[in-house]
């Protein structure tokens, strides 16, 4: 059976202990599965949640390697199996209609901070008055910062107000388009997407693949806006640097309200962890919360995954989650920091590579090439050293860590929009790592 082959393949990619503790117990649920939706049963709800967080994506990838098609993978417990059978809709039908809105994504449980406040306020305003304010809305930022949460919060809020909501990823939109085109039923496709009150498109950057799909989306976009239908899109980059898009469609995107989400500051990460713990009824002491916030990087999904891992391990081993336990459990997940690399090393190498005096870096000079070099150093310091953002701010005599966030954001934007600059920064980073 293919499912057995997949688990055997997974066994070669993880430790024997991991396989015996978690994967060996999984039972393939043939009745609840199809080629697009794969279900495995675990021995308990807690175990199912942990395995899904840690291994579902790996299992889906192995299916793709074997079959050329990536399914959705669900790990469930026997107690929840009934609900899956009652609620499961064939994934082909889901992809041909809209993604199911996750009721857990609401404005109430979204943690707002300096890094996402503008996007949050715009999304809330759009939900309050769809088609009236800020239409269309374009939310952008790197992976794992909360774009999908905000998008679906708009959808759930509008759904509660009795609005017709279509929420799809760009991949689902493309599959839906192709299905209707091949079955000569484009009228139904257009009725669906052009007669809704709110259209939500997640990861719109992937629409830049096919001219026909772009043409269809362009016409859908125009008709919805003309009818005062609300459009909200998310992307991993600003509209102006999207690749592969027709200029007319790109121009429409650029006319949107642009709301970016940047990596969360420390206070926001702490608030996110506290909120997650409250929601899942998990107790973490302040030491552990601070440790996760400081060391887990900026990806909110990874932070939430770390909390689930901690709770699962602690429950299985029946121990309290102490700082030492957290450090030991999360050591493989914690983003590697290069303790032998410090700010002085980075300044020395960046100054040499960019032909700037090290003394100019810490000066108040606003000369463009010095400002850019300073920003690169701040960006690399956050990435490669153990220094916190407040420590970096203090080193450069900045008012607070928000100035550090601003400089990092500027470098990220440049790296996304300028391939030569991106390569230059990467080269410098590699030289620092080699020396460190």
Curated annotation (Swiss-Prot):
Protein's UniProt keywords contain Nucleus: no
Record protein name field: Chromosomal replication initiator protein DnaA
Binding-site residues, ATP: 144, 146-148
Cellular location(s): Cytoplasm
Gene expressing this chain: dnaA
GO MF entry, a single one: ATP binding
Record family assignment: Belongs to the DnaA family.
Pfam families: Bac_DnaA, Bac_DnaA_C, DnaA_N
Region (Domain II): 69-99
Organism: Campylobacter concisus (strain 13826)
Record's subunit section: Oligomerizes as a right-handed, spiral filament on DNA at oriC.
Stretches the record annotates as Domain III, AAA+ region: 100-314
Domain notes: Domain I is involved in oligomerization and binding regulators, domain II is flexibile and of varying length in different bacteria, domain III forms the AAA+ region, while domain IV binds dsDNA.
Stretches for region Domain I, interacts with DnaA modulators: 1-69
């Amino acid at each position: 059976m293919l499912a057995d082959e997949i688990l055997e393949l997974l066994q070669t990619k993880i430790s024997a202990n991991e396989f015996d503790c978690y994967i060996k117990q999984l039972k393939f649920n043939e009745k609840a599965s199809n080629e697009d939706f794969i279900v495995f049963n675990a021995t308990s709800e807690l175990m199912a949640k942990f395995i899904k967080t840690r291994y579902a994506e790996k299992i889906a990838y192995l299916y793709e390697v074997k079959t050329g098609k990536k399914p959705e993978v669900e790990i469930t417990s026997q107690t929840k199996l009934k609900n899956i059978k009652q609620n499961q809709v064939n994934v082909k039908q889901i992809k041909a209609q809209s993604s199911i809105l996750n009721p857990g994504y609401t404005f109430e449980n979204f943690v707002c901070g300096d890094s996402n406040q503008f996007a949050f306020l715009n999304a809330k305003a759009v939900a309050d008055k769809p088609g009236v304010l800020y239409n269309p809305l374009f939310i952008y930022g790197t992976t794992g910062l909360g774009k999908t949460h905000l998008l679906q919060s708009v959808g759930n809020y509008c759904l509660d107000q009795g609005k017709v909501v279509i929420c799809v990823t760009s991949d689902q939109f493309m599959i839906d388009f192709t299905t209707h085109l091949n079955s000569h039923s484009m009228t139904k496709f257009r009725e669906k997407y052009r007669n809704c009150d709110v259209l939500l498109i997640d990861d719109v950057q992937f629409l830049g693949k096919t001219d026909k799909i772009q043409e269809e989306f362009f016409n859908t976009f125009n008709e919805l806006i003309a009818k005062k239908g609300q459009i909200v899109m998310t992307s991993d980059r600003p509209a102006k640097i999207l690749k592969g898009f027709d200029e007319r469609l790109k121009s429409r995107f650029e006319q949107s309200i642009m709301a970016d989400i940047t990596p969360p500051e420390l206070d926001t990460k702490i608030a996110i962890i506290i909120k997650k713990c409250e929601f899942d009824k998990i107790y973490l002491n302040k030491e552990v919360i601070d440790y996760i916030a400081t060391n887990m990087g900026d990806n909110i999904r990874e932070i939430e995954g770390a909390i689930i891992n901690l709770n699962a391990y602690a429950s299985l081993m029946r121990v309290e989650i102490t700082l030492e336990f957290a450090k030991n459990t999360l050591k493989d997940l914690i983003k590697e920091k290069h303790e032998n690399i410090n700010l002085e090393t980075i300044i020395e190498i960046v100054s040499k590579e960019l032909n700037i005096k090290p003394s100019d870096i810490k000066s108040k000079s606003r000369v463009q090439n010095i400002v850019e070099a300073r920003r690169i150093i701040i960006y690399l310091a956050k990435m490669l050293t153990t220094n916190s953002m407040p420590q970096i701010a203090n080193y450069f005599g900045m008012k607070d860590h928000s100035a550090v966030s601003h400089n990092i954001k500027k470098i990220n934007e440049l790296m996304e929009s300028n391939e030569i600059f991106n390569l230059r920064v990467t080269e410098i980073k590699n030289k620092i790592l080699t020396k460190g």
